[in-house]
Each structure stands twice: as structure tokens, then as C-alpha cells.
Amino acid sequence: LHKAIRRQRQMCIRDRATMVAFGTASSSATLPLTIACCEKRGISHKIASFVLPLGATLNFDGSALLQTVAVIFLTQAYQVPLDPFLIIQIALLAIVASSTCAGIPGGGLITIALILNGMGLSPEQLVAGFAFLFTIERITDMLRTTLNVTSDTVVAATIADNENEINYDLLNNPQAYEEIA
């Protein structure tokens, strides 16, 4: 398992699907290429075609991370007192809200507004904070999508390894990486 995850981490760095995810900022648009890259690297079609679409639909860990950080940043900027319980509540709300995001560019921005709405900010502060987040949205969206696609491939490799549905000859073949990238 450790060997599969270590090799998967290396292959995600120079993966065409990761580059397309970064450029398009869309998990859904990257999905066919992600499946193809995983299959060329030795993950069985059965695992890749089940796990990756499920991950592209539900696994938005990059969005959950950004939503948590953005809400905490804006509440601190407007001097809203945060106790540990509220920070945990923000993180849990972000995890739940991120699973409702669409896998399209800008899909996570709306959920940030929903979480901010419950933090006791005035309407003017909400608009100003949302405007600030909107200015950096494209850059953060590209990074979030790259993280989402990378974590989907790691989960697929882990499940394939547990189910003995991974071809280590393809996984350890450096020429397969050059053909894809």
C-alpha cells in the first residue's frame, strides 16, 4: 500500500490530468482524462470508472480547505470573535458545503457566501468580503481543482491496491509516464 501511494504521489505531479485540471479549474471536465491516465498507470477500469466519477462529484477537499480558511480570514478581518467551537463548526460546515459544490469553475464560491452568512457579518461586510474572494477566485479555483483531482487519483490507487486491481508493471514503468505527460 505504501509503495502504491508513494508512486501515485510521484505520478500525480507530472500528470496530464493534473495539468488540465489546473488549466480548466473543472473536475468534471478533467474526469475522462483522469480515468484514462489512471488506467494507463495500471489502475483497473472497474475501479477507475467507479471511484473517479464518485470523487469528482463528492470529493472536494480543496474546496473545503479554502472555504474554512476564507471564512476564518474574513471573520478575523472584521474582528468577529472566534472560539475553538466556532472554528470547528466552520470546518464542519465547509466539509458539508463542499460536497454540494458543482465540479465547475467557481463552484465553491457560492458555498463560501452561505457559510459567511451565518457568521454574524453585516450585509456590507458580506459584500466586501465576497468581492475580495471573487478577485482571487480564479487562482484559488485552479489550485483547489488540482488538489481535488490529485486526491481522487490517490484514493483510486489506494482502493485498487486494496482490491488487488492494480498492475504494478504499469505503475512502475517510467515510459508510461512520458507517454501520458
Annotate each language-model stretch with its function.
Residues 4, 17, 60, 138-139, ...:
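Hydrophobic alpha-helical segments, especially transmembrane helices
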Residues 3, 32, 45, 122-129:
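Short, structured coil/loop segments at alpha-helix boundaries
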Residues 68-181:
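Transmembrane alpha-helical segments and their short flanking loops
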Residues 17, 21-98, 156, 173:
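Helix-loop-helix junctions within the multi-pass membrane cores of secondary transporters/permeases
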Residues 1-13:
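Single conserved hydrophobic/aromatic residue that forms the stacking wall/gate
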Residues 16-24, 113-120:
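Small-residue-rich segments of transmembrane alpha-helices in multi-pass membrane proteins
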